[in-house]
Amino acid sequence: MENGVMMQYFEWNLPNDGMLWKRLKDDASHLHEIGISAVWIPPAYKGHEQADEGYGTYDLYDLGEFDQKGTIRTKYGTKQELQEMIEELHRNQIGVYLDAVMNHKAGADYTEKFMAREVNPDQRTEQLGEPYEIEGWTGFNFPGRGNKYSDFKWHWYHFSGIDCDVVTGKK
């Protein structure tokens, strides 16, 4: 088996212009000519806002297809553009690796009240004090997507930790 060459085709400060998928599609033949055999692309799913790089994950099933969080496209483009880019890369014998963060959630649709217990910030397995009621951004119902692809909705009981109590601001 021949050793391949993979290129990371993104960096943190890309413009929020929705053009990355188009640029990569247009660059596919050039990448093939210079010996690139695979590209690593940023998270393709909807973040908590359009400018999100994909690490503030809102909806893993929305690749730029649904009107959610004030936008249809992601920072990088639409689902259609993503599919066309992948097809063009494959035509040029270039593999595609997606960066994905499956355990991040951001931009919940609503808050929920639930019992929580404070933990030691230096040793998160050490619980401090008794459980008490807090309110957190933990409700995700994906109104723009509805139940397409999945009917799963996130609630407080799906999380093992949150950032803060929205009522008190305590972290």
Report residues per predicted region.
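Substrate-binding/active-site clefts of carbohydrate-active enzymes
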Residues: N3-D26, E33-S37, P42-K171
